[in-house]
Amino acid sequence: GAAAGASNSSALAFGGEVAPPTGKTESYDGTSWTEVNDMNTARYGQGGAGTQTAALTFGGTPPETGATESWNGTNWTEVNDLNDARQLGGSNGTQTSALLYGGTPTPGGTANTESWNGTNWTEVNNLNTPRWRLSGAGSDNTSAIAISGRNASWQAAVESWNGTSWTEVNDVNTAVIGSGAAGNQSFGLKFAGETPAPAQQAATEEWNGTNWTEVADLSEARDRPFANGSRSSALCSGGYPGSGTSPSWNATEEWSLTDLVGSWSTG
């Protein structure tokens, strides 16, 4: 699934990899989750952008789709599709200015990038490193960072988007797939994800526009969480705990930055 929202007290989570894939949508007010109207197309592995009351979702599977839907705070409406159907790409932005990059079904991941202007998707310049199961953060379709992921192997690579092209910047400390991300091109977070071993991660890294720094861990290790917010106020909810029964299936954790020190707390 995917998420939208500006902070740890205002979020929208939609879709997800359950059996069968779901179109369910839930809204978070900082205290509790409330079910609202479903998406038109049930799916997982899609992109997400926007806020709790003005969101966008695009792509996903099964099968790989280019379907795009817009949320007005009450209902989802089908709008113009992606040019290339795909799942498990990185995404960021707003309901009217969004970006999607990477993903599958191309073997080893695609480098394709598409930009949304509120009406149509346009193919723009590709990532330098093709990959899938990456994460992304950014304010709109002119400013983004593409984080980690994999192709033939796990990638620590990070790329910065300026509205025209991608530039390689400093790598994350730990290469992961299926991580959550929040923030923007200059101030961001990467959290959770999966490594070859010991698999699901609780690690969090903070981005200052130049370097990544390891900071406080999540309470629950997981990958593929719903993620939204900013570097100072982020939300990590749901996700895959790896095996067995775990609170990670529905656990919500809130990130807060106080006096330049960040920490997670149970939502």
Predicted regions and their residues:
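Polar, enzyme-active/binding microenvironments
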Residues: 1-267
